[in-house]
């Protein structure tokens, strides 16, 4: 799927589900890592993570588009477009837009460091490096040591 097909898909879904036209751009952004898509407030564009399409197919992209279109149409209408707003919750439920998308990588796959407690030997896996002089074990307050670097 390319950006032109994505643009047409967004325009069609906007007409079908919301009864309103989508007048801005929708495109894939390969720099998105932890989110399925995002609605840009200043430009009103919608960005979609291409990895979602590669991993889960067109059905997942449709769900992400519906979610982002909820943000889009509510923001354009001047209503509450944030996840916490009742307008957003109501509209997303009406059109069947999910609150979350499937994650591409689990936390375990993204982890770079493995630590252990010197006292109780509890294991901690982290994406970012931890300052072992400041951080302590959450179970017994023991000292942490790096066991290995995973990547």
UniProtKB/Swiss-Prot annotation:
A Pfam family assignment: SprT-like
Domain of life: Bacteria
Chain ranges passing through the membrane: none
Any one Gene Ontology cellular component term annotated for this protein: cytoplasm
Cofactor note: Binds 1 zinc ion.
Matching HAMAP family: SprT_like (MF_00745)
One BP annotation, GO: response to stress
Binding positions for Zn(2+) per the UniProt entry: 67, 71
Keywords: Cytoplasm, Metal-binding, Zinc
Record-given protein name: Protein SprT-like
Family: Belongs to the SprT family.
Domain called SprT-like: residue spans: 6-147
Record GO terms (molecular function): zinc ion binding
Active site: 68
Primary location class: cytoplasm
Subcellular location: Cytoplasm
Needed co-factor(s): Zn(2+)
